[in-house]
């Protein structure tokens, strides 16, 4: 049996724990199985269990994960009777990236399963709540066919649900213009319009971020005045 499990979920949704559960189930059924777990956080945690985040570390983790994926698929193709499980448990917010991974493993003959996590546990790495909620919304807006929604053991609180509602309502409101700063890229836009842009941290100056409209904005023609102003903006 050769299987690929894609786990999607915001920070603190229980992805890592669920991945361990699925790995144990597979190992119990196929005792000689090779388990390959791909997750950026695992690659950014040292041998002493210390998590070290940086833009450079993320890039290295992604490259390491991609290389491990390629190598494991190659082993699977060369050994079709070998029991292998690949678990990919990053947040996996982009549906296009998920589809690419699924197409890739199917070409190598792997069976696939997709799971979406909905828990709201405290995330281990101090990600701001707004960023967590934005990731949750983005996942809702970027669904993948045949994904299995895992019932939450610890669902969102009433307060979190209200914040999610406010963030979603933001998209229905006209843009506000900050007269003092002479910009459409307001604090409110940065807080609630995050699905429309990416913020990439500088490797040399990690406190700075470069803003750029999301690729989906281009494909869906969802440009607004803030996004037109934003390209290449550094904050």
Where are the regions that the model predicts?
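Residues that form ligand- and interface-recognition hot spots within folded domains
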Residues: 9, 22, 90-92, 116-119
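Acidic, metal-coordinating catalytic cores used for nucleic-acid/nucleotide bond scission
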Residues: 87-101
């Amino acid at each position: 049996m050769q299987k690929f499990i894609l786990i999607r979920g915001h920070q603190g949704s229980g992805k890592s724990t669920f991945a361990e559960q699925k790995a144990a189930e597979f190992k119990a059924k196929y005792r000689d199985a090779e388990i390959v777990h791909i997750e950026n956080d695992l690659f950014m945690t040292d041998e002493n269990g210390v998590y070290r985040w940086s833009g450079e570390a993320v890039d290295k983790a992604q490259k390491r994960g991609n290389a491990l994926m390629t190598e494991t698929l190659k082993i699977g193709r060369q050994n079709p009777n070998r029991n292998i499980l690949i678990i990919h448990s990053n947040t996996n917010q982009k549906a296009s990236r998920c589809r690419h991974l699924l197409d890739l493993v199917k070409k190598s003959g792997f069976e696939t399963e997709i799971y979406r996590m909905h828990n709201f546990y405290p995330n281990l790495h101090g990600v701001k709540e707004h960023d967590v909620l934005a990731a949750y919304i983005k996942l809702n807006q970027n669904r993948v066919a045949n994904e299995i929604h895992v019932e939450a053991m610890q669902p969102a609180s009433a307060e979190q649900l209200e914040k999610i509602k406010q963030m979603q309502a933001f998209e229905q409101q006209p843009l506000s213009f900050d007269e003092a700063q002479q910009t459409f890229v307001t604090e409110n836009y940065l807080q609630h319009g995050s699905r429309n842009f990416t913020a990439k941290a500088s490797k040399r100056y990690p406190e700075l971020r470069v803003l750029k409209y999301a690729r989906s904005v281009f494909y869906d023609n969802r440009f607004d005045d803030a996004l037109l102003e934003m390209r290449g903006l550094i904050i």
